[in-house]
């Protein structure tokens, strides 16, 4: 009698994020991974063997941004605070490298940032024009956009995402610029996250992603001054997971038919399962 067990049946983990079909529920969060840099430094086959079901690149803006002064990153007892400042080369330089992504075996949701509705829409319009003109196979599979409305707003230093009216204006401008799937990334730094969610959906967003990082500060123990060059930054990691779960659950209850992407402190498969269960 053979003690060899039959192979376990394959489990279908595929899901749909609105119109976007995903092989499984795991999507990388914007800013956590640069696929081109990783492929260049560590694994030339990474684009073809990409493990995530979709790729959300670091936020791109209409004009180049140098980001915040260093230091930009520091650890905490249960997470990391970063203050990168949306450093990026601007949409036109960013578009110029899209050909290098053509081998990426996953749909792409482009993260878009800005300081005004016009800036957000300008990024999307430039990308739409390029994608429409590009020959097949020369660009990645861009399925939609994630609107990062948690970036600083120059008017009074506020966050766009903290103001439902400003959020709706950004989403409306972007909705007019594309027919592709549109996610709005919500800030957790508000009293009621569902207010901005309702504003985004009312203005034409197809889905919501949450949460972005929590505004936080670390002091230099020697000088007792803020450690980061920007004074404050965004806290991520295990410390924020219970709060992120609560917010995702609130949004899921408020908008039960809306596609959602949950994030914040996911370190293990069980962490991811908790977000799915919300």
Where are the regions a protein language model picked out?
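N-terminal capping/small domains of soluble enzymes
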Residues: 2-108, 114-115
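Short beta-strand/loop segments at the ligand-binding rim of alpha/beta enzyme cores
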Residues: 21-27, 104-109, 177-188, 253-263
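Conserved, mostly hydrophobic/aromatic
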Residues: 28, 55, 94, 110, ...
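Active-site beta-loop-alpha junctions enriched in small/polar residues
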Residues: 31-33, 60, 113-115, 150-152, ...
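Catalytic cores of alpha/beta
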Residues: 37-45, 120-130, 190-203, 252-257, ...
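Glycine-rich, proline-tolerant flexible connector loops at the mouths of alpha/beta enzymes
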Residues: 59-86, 143-160, 214-219, 229-232
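Active-site beta->alpha loop and helix N-cap motifs at the rims of alpha/beta catalytic domains
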Residues: 77-159
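Glycine/Thr-rich beta-alpha phosphate-binding loop at enzyme active sites
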Residues: 149-165, 196-258
């Amino acid at each position: 009698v053979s003690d060899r067990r039959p192979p376990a049946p394959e489990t279908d983990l595929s899901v749909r994020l609105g119109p976007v079909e995903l092989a499984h529920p795991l999507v990388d969060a914007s800013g956590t991974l640069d696929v081109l840099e990783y492929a260049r430094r560590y694994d030339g086959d990474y684009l073809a063997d990409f493990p995530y079901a979709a790729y959300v690149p670091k936020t791109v803006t209409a004009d180049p941004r140098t980001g915040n002064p260093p230091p930009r990153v520091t650890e905490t007892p249960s997470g990391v605070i970063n203050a990168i400042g949306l450093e990026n080369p601007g949409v036109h330089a960013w578009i110029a490298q899209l050909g290098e992504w053509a081998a990426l075996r996953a749909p792409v949701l482009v993260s878009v940032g800005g300081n005004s509705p016009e800036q957000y829409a300008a990024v999307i319009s430039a990308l739409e024009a390029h994608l429409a003109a590009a020959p097949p196979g020369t660009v990645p599979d861009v399925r939609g956009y994630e609107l990062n409305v948690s970036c600083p707003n120059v008017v009074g230093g506020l966050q766009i995402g903290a103001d439902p009216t400003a959020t709706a204006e950004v989403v409306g401008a972007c909705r007019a610029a594309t027919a592709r799937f549109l996610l709005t990334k919500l800030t957790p730094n508000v009293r009621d996250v569902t207010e901005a969610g309702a504003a985004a959906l009312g203005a034409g967003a197809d889905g919501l992603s949450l949460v972005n990082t929590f505004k936080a500060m670390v002091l230099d123990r020697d000088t007792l001054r803020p450690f980061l060059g920007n004074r404050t930054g965004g806290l991520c990691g295990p410390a924020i997971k219970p709060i992120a779960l609560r917010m995702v659950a609130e949004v899921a209850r408020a908008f039960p038919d809306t596609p959602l992407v949950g994030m914040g402190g996911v370190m293990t498969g069980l962490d991811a399962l908790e977000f799915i269960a919300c």
